[in-house]
């Protein structure tokens, strides 16, 4: 297991734990300061029951979406770390490791890879300070989500 996966695993366990209110408030405010979170669009850190609640916080009000048809809208507050053409079945570098696009996409459905094998890709990196929710500002019906 890559070190970043191990760190994520243990941090996730810690983040889900709900501590006594004064301790949780200290943890939350420390995390906000340490990571440099901009909380202007969110509730005050003291209102979150766990670090995970803070990590997956909701926006107080909806963001305005640019309606220009030529604008590309990101589904996340993130940094695009890679983009390009899928070549030789390798396009994804996640947490320090390369992944086979075919293996990643066919784990649940074998026909997924054929649809994208000559396509393009983008990797979105969400840092610990980023807003960790996804949005799809388009008119469609989601049939399946694989995480």
Residue ranges and their predicted role:
Residues 1-147:
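Non-catalytic terminal segments and appended small domains
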């Amino acid at each position: 297991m890559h070190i970043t996966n191990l760190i994520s695993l243990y941090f996730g366990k810690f983040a889900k734990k709900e501590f006594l209110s004064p301790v949780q408030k200290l943890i939350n405010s420390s995390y906000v300061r340490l990571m440099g979170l901009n909380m202007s669009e969110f509730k005050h850190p003291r209102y979150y029951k766990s670090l995970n609640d803070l990590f997956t916080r909701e926006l107080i009000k909806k963001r305005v979406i640019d309606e220009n048809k030529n604008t590309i809208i990101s589904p996340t507050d993130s940094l695009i770390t890679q983009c390009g053409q899928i070549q030789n079945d390798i396009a994804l570098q996640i947490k320090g490791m390369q992944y086979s696009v075919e293996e990643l996409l066919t784990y649940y459905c074998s026909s997924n890879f054929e649809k994208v094998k000559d396509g393009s890709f983008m990797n979105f990196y969400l840092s610990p300070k980023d807003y960790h929710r996804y949005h799809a500002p388009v008119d469609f019906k989601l049939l399946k989500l694989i995480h």
